[in-house]
UniProtKB/Swiss-Prot annotation:
Annotated GO CC locations: cytosolic large ribosomal subunit
Keyword annotations from UniProtKB, A to Z: Ribonucleoprotein, Ribosomal protein
Membrane-spanning parts: none
Pfam families (alphabetical): Ribosomal_L13e
Family: Belongs to the eukaryotic ribosomal protein eL13 family.
GO molecular function: RNA binding; structural constituent of ribosome
Species of origin: Chlamydomonas sp. (strain W80)
Protein name: Large ribosomal subunit protein eL13
Gene: RPL13
Length: 208
């Protein structure tokens, strides 16, 4: 019942609203269908890994997100060269390749090279001709003992840097630390422009 000065309860429905009600009765069957599809995909891709190609570890773009790491599109040609894997051979053994990405950090380059070497060490390459296996292909015994990699390939593990606790000094409290970082970024960006301007001014003085 209505109490006080409240509005009278009235369902504001459209005509034929029953036809527009969304139900969720197919949820359990959908779950089973997805599970069956995953099993069929794993069976079809055997002996290749279920997760697909191996992806590199990259950093997100821009100052806002570059502290975060994620899996990228593919390994660079430089990373493949350092790991001793030919660029045309890599996609045939489940290694994603991205010829456009460039290495701007030695740390990332070394991490991805190590990632490639770890993957290559655990890789079992089935020979095309079992009677005449090539040097890099596995033997019949290794092929029979091989198992399909389930789940994520070499999952990305978050590592926390070791922090050293120090006492806050008076110099640290002076000014804005963020402001100092911004000034350093500006100085790095304008370094070439300022050097060119100084060189031009010096040349003008010499001409005079």
């Amino acid at each position: 019942m209505v109490r006080g000065n409240d509005m009278l309860p009235n369902g504001h429905f459209h005509k034929k609203w029953q036809f527009h009600v969304k139900t969720w009765f197919n949820q359990p069957a959908r779950k089973q269908r997805r599970r069956n599809a995953r099993a069929e995909k794993a069976k079809a891709t055997f002996p290749r890994p279920v997760a697909g190609s191996l992806k590199p570890i990259v950093r997100c773009q821009t100052v806002k997100y570059n502290t975060k790491q994620r899996l990228g599109r593919g390994f660079t040609l430089e990373e493949l060269k350092e790991a001793g894997i030919p660029a045309k051979f890599a996609p045939t053994v489940g290694i994603a390749v991205d010829h456009r990405r460039k290495n701007r950090s030695l740390e990332t380059l070394q991490a991805n090279v190590q990632r490639l070497k770890t993957y290559r060490a655990s890789l079992v390459i089935f020979p095309r001709n079992m009677k005449k296996p090539k040097a890099f292909e596995a033997s019949a015994a290794d092929c029979s003992a091989a198992s399909q990699a389930k789940g994520e390939l070499l999952p990305l593990k978050g590592t926390k840097p070791a922090l050293e606790l120090v006492k806050i000094t008076a110099d640290m409290k002076e000014g804005s630390q963020y402001g100092k970082l911004r000034i350093e970024r500006v100085n790095a960006r304008l370094k070439g422009m300022r050097e060119k301007r100084a060189a031009d001014e010096a040349a003008k003085k010499d001409d005079k």
